Amino acid sequence: MQKRIHEVNIGANVPKKWPNWLHRFGCFMLDRRGWRVSGNFINEDKAILAVAPHTSNWDFFIGLMVVFSFRLNINFFGKHTIFFPPLGYIIRRLGGIPIRRTKAHGVVNNIVEQIKSSQHLLLALAPEGTRSPIFPWKTGFMHIAREASVPVQLIGLDYDTKTIVLGPIIQKVDNIEEQMQTIYAFYANVSAKYSAKCITNSK
């Protein structure tokens, strides 16, 4: 069942911020563009939000409007090279955290420690790790969730139906290879902005 953005209930455990005017602005922009929401948002203060398919810069704009609409206090990672002033200040205010991607294993460990040491942290990640076509997807987000002992919610940006799909929740990450098949199956039914860039099988 599709609902208007402002009709979605956000649980008491979900960390929130943003003033009323940004909440109204986010709702207005999504309504104006015809976007709706389907499903329920995870009621946790720590979680990985796997947002896909990520094939366009528009994905960030849609995601940001959702964050404003729900008043979500979330974090996301970006290349350290974009965190220069004054842009870096704005990105940090929006929840951005700079990372260097030269050492993937070190990045995972660093994120895990940040989650463990934080009182609350909703971390939005693109499971593909790139806007370019790729298969298999990168599994760093699953390793982070497993090592930090936090759940993963799958969130789809369906451009065909203009729906933000709040999908299934993986409460415990254990068998990553098997659980990735569940993830591929979910996103196979979500239409990307550029469908040719979203690959959910090896064919």
Language model regions located:
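Intrinsically disordered, low-complexity regions
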Residues: 2-7, 118, 195-196
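Extreme N-terminal tail/first-helix region
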Residues: 1-36
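Soluble catalytic domains of membrane acyltransferases
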Residues: 10-15, 32, 36-189, 198-203
